[in-house]
A protein has these predicted regions:
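Aromatic- and Gly/Pro-enriched helix-to-coil junctions and flexible linker segments
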Residues: 1-89
């Protein structure tokens, strides 16, 4: 069964993560924002989700979540699978 945003991804973000990133225009709990297919200079498609993932893994800095426990390998794999599965709702 594909990984879904509502069931598998959104619950991984703590309320403090959502509030913190909202100040920077990053809507972690908004499926439309996270699944937007638009690319940028770094990623050819789905830049919003791909930048979030890069910050979760530490490939982009500052690493997320700020001031909190970093995601486990299992949680990161789930997010990566969500992207691989096609950003399912």
């Amino acid at each position: 069964m594909p990984v879904s945003f509502a069931t598998d991804i959104e619950p991984l973000f703590r309320p403090t993560d959502i509030a913190c990133m909202h100040r920077f225009g990053v809507e972690l709990n908004d499926y439309g924002y996270m699944s937007d297919a638009t690319g940028d200079d770094t990623f050819p498609d789905h830049a919003n989700a791909r930048h979030v993932y890069a910050r979760l893994t530490g490939d982009e800095l500052p690493r997320m979540p700020m001031g909190g426990t970093f995601w486990s390998d299992e949680q990161l794999a789930c997010f990566n699978q969500w992207m691989t599965d096609g950003f399912q709702a």
